[in-house]
Design a protein with these regions (language model features):
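Acidic, surface-exposed loops and disordered segments
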Residues: 1-159
Length: 159
């Protein structure tokens, strides 16, 4: 079975952790493009429930682009979010989780940090950002960005 990753999946799983502090520098344009293309090509999970994912990332010199997407202070200097929306089909949460984790592992392979956010974000603002329709919900989002060089208190919360 071929994978879209440059490293074995098991290695990426071991490498990935919940990154809560990021550099203020936005994700580079090339990595944004690669991640957006991967997201566009991997929208479903193994059970086929409809899910949608998108990258919302700040451009160079435009850190304010993500202002107002509330994460209650758990994440420092996020320069991007992986947004996801899903309908109300059977096995939808399984498909959502599978697809989101595959995207997260790709981001890890690009050298980016990520952190799942399930209950510590303002769902209505993220739903608006991904244009979720009335039958869709946003169960989780993931912060993404360049990993901060110096780990602080938030980072010490990771297992």
């Amino acid at each position: 079975m071929t994978t879209p990753f440059s490293k074995p999946t098991t290695e990426l799983i071991k490498q990935r952790y919940s990154c809560r502090e990021y550099e203020e520098t936005p994700i580079g344009a090339d990595k944004q493009r690669q991640l957006s293309e991967f997201i566009a090509a991997h929208q479903t999970g193994p059970f086929g429930s409809p899910t949608r994912f998108a990258l919302a990332a700040a451009a160079e010199g435009d850190r304010q682009a993500l202002r107002g997407l509330g994460t209650y202070g758990f994440i420092k200097n996020p320069t991007g979010y992986i947004l996801g929306a899903m309908g109300d089909e059977e096995k939808n949460l399984e498909d959502f989780g599978y697809a989101m984790e595959r995207i997260i592992l790709f981001a890890t392979d690009l050298g980016l940090g990520t952190c799942w956010l399930g209950g510590s974000f303002t769902k209505s603002r993220f739903a608006k950002r991904i244009s979720a329709n009335g039958s869709e919900r946003v169960p989780a989002v993931t912060s993404v960005g360049r990993i901060a060089a110096k780990a602080g208190f938030r980072q010490s919360l990771s297992p």
